[in-house]
Each structure stands twice: as C-alpha cells, then as structure tokens.
C-alpha cells in the first residue's frame, strides 16, 4: 500500500535519525581505518559477522523497456536519486547537479547513475526515454527507471530517501532531493543535498574516496 503524507512523516524523521546516528557512530569508528567512508543504516551481527544495511535488488524497468536489477550492472558504484519529470520545485535543481556528476564521471566505467521516477502514472517508459534523449546523456551510463509504485516507494526507503504522496505538495508528491552513493555491494556509503551545489561539490571527494577504496 502506498503511504500517505501523515504516515510517512514519522518514517521520514525516523530515517533521518537512523542515518544521522549511524553516520556519527561509524564515522568515529572509522578514524583508525584511514578515514574510510561509513556504512549508513542499521547493521546486524550474524554468526559473528557484521551484516551492513543492503539495498535489495529490486526489478526495475529502464527507459528502453529493459527489465533489470542493480546486479545486472556488475561491480559498479552507483549515484542515485528519486524524481518525477513534471516536478516544478526541487527536481530541476537536482537534475543540474546530477548532470554535474554525469559530466565528472561519464568516462569512468566504474560509476553509473540511476534516476527513479516516483510518478508512475505520467512517467511512462516512452516519457522517460524522451526525457533522457532531451538531456543528451548516454543511457548506458545514466539509467532512468520505473517500477510499480509500491516497489519504488519501498526502494526509496531502502535508500533512506523520503518519498510521500501529499495532495498539498506540488503535483501531489513531497520528496527528498538527496543524491545517494551506493557501493558495489549495494551498501549506502554517503549522500549529498542535490539542491545545494556546494554540497555536491564536496560530494565529489566522497565519491572519489569510495572509488579509491573499492578498486584497490
């Protein structure tokens, strides 16, 4: 069931709290590990092994009608956001920053970009294809995904991104403009505010640090 704004508001702050606390505790723990990036989210101890929060391998449909999973792309680092094409507020700002990330890493085969629409009613595969074409980007590098609404909302939760059905919000959605960094094991390793160019500039070094540690 798709969540309403009232039910999601509590989840929104819960996720922010989880990410913040996890980030602070693990950041302290990483000081003796060459300042490695933290793992965000809850972790479990199973048979003595630490199991970090992992984004599930959802089945998605891209702008070319291909059904894929994250694991379809092999050992990549992923930069992901959630948007919808008719969004009149934060999405155009986030798009500009995603384009900056695309330009910076377009020749780096280790990095891919994922944009997930939260408006399944209007953002069909055909619309996503046209949107990608108008951006002029390589869709082998930057994928535009759709899926069943419940799946996309659940995926956003796993990325720690707030997505809410809200009739009072522009076009009926209230959502976060965060850009999320995922390592090749689908662990959330960092994020930036996609509406803030300075946050994205600082994020470059975060991505570079992950690449340096993931591909030693």
Named regions from a protein language model:
Residues 68-98, 114:
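Short active-site neighborhood of thiol/selenol oxidoreductases, capturing the structured segment around
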